[in-house]
């Protein structure tokens, strides 16, 4: 009898372990698809529209061509020649290059330009954009697959919707913003882990990466994190306040680690004309609800990047609107 019970127990344990292994494999496959499908979509778009290396066009427009590319050219020379990142004599009598680096060029993805010739920088940056979009799908897949035990292709579809959103299409030429968008799902995942499991390491590292790569978008992520924390479902008031202390400490720790670039960036901004009078701007609505709703329909125009009206690229699709309704 004892042997039979032991055999049954062993069989159940093996069955449970096999289920766990299958779930892990399935999750890995979904995450991989969340990376490769946006990558294939972007590669297809590059082929159709003749973006380098499949033609002479570029994913960069406006400031991307006239401002960012010269910055990448200087960075390329500095990395290849072993020059300092603190200063550059390429502009006038010289400029504080570190403050410029902290906003435009601090992404680790930019090291990939070293694998290209200087004449291929435009192609290199376009490929970096495609890679960041694909990685955004992957990080979204990691987050969404962690939210449910039942893994399905819907996880991949939602991740693709995030990676190929209207925001990405409209602003992908602002290549320095994409790192923060890419790491955003991990920031949220880390924040939830901090609240539920008292483990703030992932949140701290993810927020540090966002602050290090681009403080502009990271500032918006910080605002979102505060709002997300306030409206999160806590078990008790005690948990809300005690986790709040941890939330604040890990947030300050992330900012402290990123201070190596945040402080030079702040000092650099203070020396500019816009930094002399740092006051809150006037607020006004740039669009109306009817126009925003109209953008959600098929055959509409959800993307606005050929003018400077300041309208936000907010597109979630009519199916989402109907689901919310």
Segments predicted by a language model, with ranges:
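Active-site lumenal/periplasmic loops and adjacent helix-entry segments of GT-C-fold
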Residues: 48-148, 153-185, 209-213, 301-307
